[in-house]
Amino acid sequence: MSVTLVTASGMGVSAHRVDEYLQAARIAIDPDRVQLELDLTPGIALAETILADIDRDHDGSLSSEEQRAYGRLVLDALTVDIDGTPVRAELASAGFPGADEIRRGEGTVRLQLTAALPGLSSGVHHLRFRNRHHPDRSVYLANALVPASDRVSVTAQRRDANQTELTIDYTLRAAPVRPPAAWLLGGLVAATALSALAIRPLRSFR
């Protein structure tokens, strides 16, 4: 996924306070799907609270199952819709720091999500993303990434005051018409020649 932002928000990811849970979302739109990167960084004052959400058996380690469970918990708090129609996002991958890194306020949970889009006509479309995960003492950032496909052009981004909601206006261009393959053209030429021979009137011998 490209990491180039269409526009950058005013707050750097590393500038969050110790008593905040920074949630930074980056969204990439392709013609047939949307990909989301979500970085979750708790400050020192919130570290134990977030760790308790992840480390459900309280053994001090973050097991693969606990990581997946927390990823699903975050996913349940996110919504994505295209032109008002909800689309289902799925957790593609998750990266978790160690518990000690989180306690020091240096650990970032990185989630990658993907959602298939319905067949869309060319023209203007609107994708809306909402994040309702852990609203207490969280700070949200949301930005669109520069599309990888030249068929997609982001034209505007609209956020609510807290950046829990981002609407991306974009234009989708029609897929280019591909010329027929050379072998297909050759086959058509041969078929045309054979057809011409088949319909040629036979001459009688005198």
Segments and roles (model prediction):
Residues G12-V189, S195-A196:
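N-terminal soluble domains immediately following signal/targeting peptides that reside
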